[in-house]
Amino acid sequence: MYQDLIRSELTEAADVLQKFLSDDHNIAQIEAAAKLIADSFKQGGKVLSCGNGGSHCDAMHFAEELTGRYRENRPGYPGIAISDPSHLSCVSNDFGYDYVFSRYVEAVGAKGDVLFGLSTSGNSGNILKAIEAAKAKGMKTIALTGKDGGKMAGLADVEIRVPHFGYADRIQEVHIKIIHIIIQLIEKEMA
C-alpha cells in the first residue's frame, strides 16, 4: 500500500547524502571539525554542543557518545550537551530563549574549548548568540547547518553545510552521519 512512498523517501534520503558526498569541501570540513575537537581535548579542553528540537537531540547524542563510547571501548572525552532542563527553563524565563545556550557558554566555556552548534536552517537565534559568546571566550566554533547556511554562513571556524532546501529531516539525517564520523575520527586522533 505504501511501498512507493517508502521507496520515494529512501531514494530522496540517498540523493541528499550523495549530493553532500560529491563535494570534496564537505569531506575536508568533517576532517577539520574532528581535528579541531581532538586538538582541544589534547590541550585539556572540552566541547559544548547545542541545538533545537531534533538538533537538540543530536547535540545530546554527540555528547553522550563522547563521554560514553561510540564503537570501541576507550576513555571518555569531555563532551557536554547544553541540555539541563533547569538551566534551559531558568534562562528562557529570565532572559529569553535566545540566550539559553550563550549563558551556558559564558558560564562554563573557556579559551581552547569548542562550541558545536547544530541548526538545519542556520538561522537559530540562540545558536548565533552561542557562537558570539564562544568567540568572546576564545573558543573555537563548529556549525552543522543546512540549506544555504543561513545567518551562520561564514561565522564558525568550521561550517559543515548540507545543501538541501526541502524538509529539515533530510538535513538531520546527514547531520547524524556527520556526527558519527566526527566521533570516529576523534577516536583515531586520540588513540
Swiss-Prot record:
Binds 1 zinc ion per subunit. Its main location: cytoplasm. Belongs to the SIS family. GmhA subfamily. The gene is gmhA. The reaction produces a racemic mixture of D-glycero-alpha-D-manno-heptose 7-phosphate and D-glycero-beta-D-manno-heptose 7-phosphate. Pathway: Carbohydrate biosynthesis; D-glycero-D-manno-heptose 7-phosphate biosynthesis; D-glycero-alpha-D-manno-heptose 7-phosphate and D-glycero-beta-D-manno-heptose 7-phosphate from sedoheptulose 7-phosphate: step 1/1; Bacterial outer membrane biogenesis; LPS core biosynthesis. Transmembrane segments: none annotated. Keywords: Carbohydrate metabolism, Cytoplasm, Isomerase, Lipopolysaccharide biosynthesis, Metal-binding, Zinc. Pfam families: SIS_2. Its cofactor is Zn(2+). GO terms for cellular component: cytosol. It comes from Vibrio cholerae serotype O1 (strain ATCC 39315 / El Tor Inaba N16961). GO terms for molecular function: carbohydrate derivative binding; D-sedoheptulose 7-phosphate isomerase activity; zinc ion binding. Catalyzes the isomerization of sedoheptulose 7-phosphate in D-glycero-D-manno-heptose 7-phosphate. Substrate binds at N52, G53, G54, E65, N93, D94, S119, T120, S121, S124, Q172. It catalyses: 2 D-sedoheptulose 7-phosphate = D-glycero-alpha-D-manno-heptose 7-phosphate + D-glycero-beta-D-manno-heptose 7-phosphate. Its EC number is 5.3.1.28. Residues 37-191 form the SIS domain. Homotetramer. Zn(2+) binds at H61, E65, Q172, H180. InterPro entries: GmhA/DiaA, Phosphoheptose_Isoase, SIS_dom, SIS_dom_sf, SIS_GmhA/DiaA_subfam. This is Phosphoheptose isomerase. It is found in: Cytoplasm. GO terms for biological process: D-glycero-D-manno-heptose 7-phosphate biosynthetic process; lipopolysaccharide core region biosynthetic process.
